[in-house]
């Protein structure tokens, strides 16, 4: 229910009964009003009231809520480690199921319908849609279950704040893409090769039908990825500390892309999306932002490049004479492409400025839940066998981009 926490995120009073503490540390009974005039129910934690970028902030500036009632001091690092470990290996199981189903898809369909089927565009996109989104994702939700899950207090995010977040996304994408491209270039030069994922993705996007891009990249991918890396992870780990949950969600999301080109901006976006989800309690906001980013980069930008003939340019790389002739013919269209890139750069710059200003003015803040792990939280989240297996899988993904494994 909106505004309520379930399971283990109930404040306990000195008698061990479900109670509430307002910011002043008062133990409020059901039906009582806090300082802000909120009528709190059992199991509900009052939110501070000063307006911030997302959600609310405390009346005393940006300080955290204070719990003055005697509370049993426990070391929550062990249950925290277990909670993170469970989510990390379950995400690995999702990846394993998707990989196995993709292998079966790539072997089974040509065997049934002939080898020519691999040249059909729907076959290529179907390798993502069917194994990852239609099979592996529902199984992941089933495996994830509801153990340790809490319900985060919900707040509305206005249109203005959503647009501010869009600009921040543009800034993160711009900076992250530059960092990722530079590292990918250096690694490619050292390995005397190019990233397989990057080349494959470029060819797939430039030669694709807009319908498949919108369906897969613009709609399905944001829904599935936000449900896995934001809602599923955070609902089960945020009670041990918002900061660790946000960082872990974002970094795992970035690493899961499996290449340097996308890793850094995806991690940055993941951190921002995780923060927004924790402050609003509504996954639809991060999904809509994720859709906006993907539709802009993979649908609008790619559509403009297709219109300008960049797919034909890619096909003529081995014929310099024909390429030069074509470049002269499509020069006006190329100028339009560069104009679009200029617009994206301006949006990215505005986003970077907004992030810097928001950080300087402390618009981003964290709230300490009752089971917050002050020390050793990051170690508990990252030093466990679930994360070890996840990182081994990630290393394989990154290495396979530059090394051709002949299995």
Model-derived features: positions:
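Low-complexity, intrinsically disordered extramembrane tails and loops of integral membrane proteins
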Residues: 1-82, 369-373
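Transmembrane alpha-helical insertion/packing segments
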Residues: 70-129, 192-195, 207-244, 306-308, ...
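Interfacial transmembrane-helix boundary/kink motif in multi-pass membrane proteins
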Residues: 72-96, 121, 147-179, 334-335, ...
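Hydrophobic alpha-helical membrane-insertion segments
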Residues: 95-103, 164-181, 286-303, 341-346
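Alpha-helical transmembrane segments of multi-pass membrane proteins
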Residues: 98-111, 176-181, 395-404
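Membrane-helix interface linkers and caps
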Residues: 114-116, 121-170, 174, 185, ...
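Juxtamembrane helix-loop-helix connectors linking adjacent transmembrane helices
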Residues: 118-123, 154-221, 235, 399-407
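Transmembrane helix-loop-helix hairpins at the membrane interface
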Residues: 208-407
């Amino acid at each position: 229910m909106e505004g309520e926490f379930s399971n283990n995120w109930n404040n306990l009073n000195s008698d061990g009964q479900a109670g509430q503490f307002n910011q002043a540390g008062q133990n409020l009974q059901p039906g009582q009003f806090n300082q802000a005039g909120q009528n709190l129910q059992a199991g509900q934690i009052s939110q501070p009231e000063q307006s911030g970028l997302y959600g609310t902030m405390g009346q005393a500036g940006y300080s955290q809520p204070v719990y003055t009632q005697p509370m049993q001091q426990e070391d929550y690092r062990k249950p925290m480690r277990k909670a993170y470990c469970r989510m990390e290996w379950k995400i690995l199981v999702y990846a394993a199921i998707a990989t196995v189903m993709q292998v079966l898809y790539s072997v089974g369909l040509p065997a049934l319908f002939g080898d020519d089927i691999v040249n059909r565009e729907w076959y290529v996109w179907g390798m993502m849609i069917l194994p990852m989104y239609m099979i592996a994702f529902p199984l992941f939700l089933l495996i994830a279950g509801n153990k340790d899950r809490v319900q985060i207090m919900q707040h509305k995010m206005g249109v203005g704040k959503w647009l501010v977040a869009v600009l921040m996304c543009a800034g993160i994408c711009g900076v992250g893409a530059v960092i990722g491209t530079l590292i990918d270039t250096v690694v490619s030069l050292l390995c005397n090769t190019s990233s397989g994922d990057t080349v494959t993705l470029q060819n797939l996007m430039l030669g694709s039908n807009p319908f498949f891009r919108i369906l897969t990249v613009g709609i399905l991918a944001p829904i599935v990825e936000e449900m896995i890396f934001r809602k599923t992870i955070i609902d089960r780990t945020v009670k041990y500390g918002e900061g660790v949950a946000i960082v872990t969600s974002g970094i795992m999301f970035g690493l899961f892309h499996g290449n340097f080109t996308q890793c850094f901006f995806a991690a940055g976006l993941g951190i921002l999306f995780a923060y927004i989800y924790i402050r609003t309690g509504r996954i639809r906001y991060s999904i809509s932002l994720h859709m906006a980013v993907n539709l802009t980069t993979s649908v609008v930008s790619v559509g403009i490049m297709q219109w300008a003939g960049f797919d034909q340019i890619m096909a003529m790389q081995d014929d310099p004479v024909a390429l030069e002739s074509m470049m002269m013919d499509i020069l006006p269209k190329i100028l339009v492409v560069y104009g679009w890139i200029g617009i994206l750069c301006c949006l990215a710059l505005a986003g970077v400025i907004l992030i810097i200003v928001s950080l300087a003015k402390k618009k981003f803040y964290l709230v300490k839940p009752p089971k917050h792990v002050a020390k050793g939280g990051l170690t508990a989240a990252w030093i466990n066998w679930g994360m070890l297996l996840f990182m081994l899988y990630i290393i394989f993904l990154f290495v396979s981009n530059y090394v051709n494994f002949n299995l």
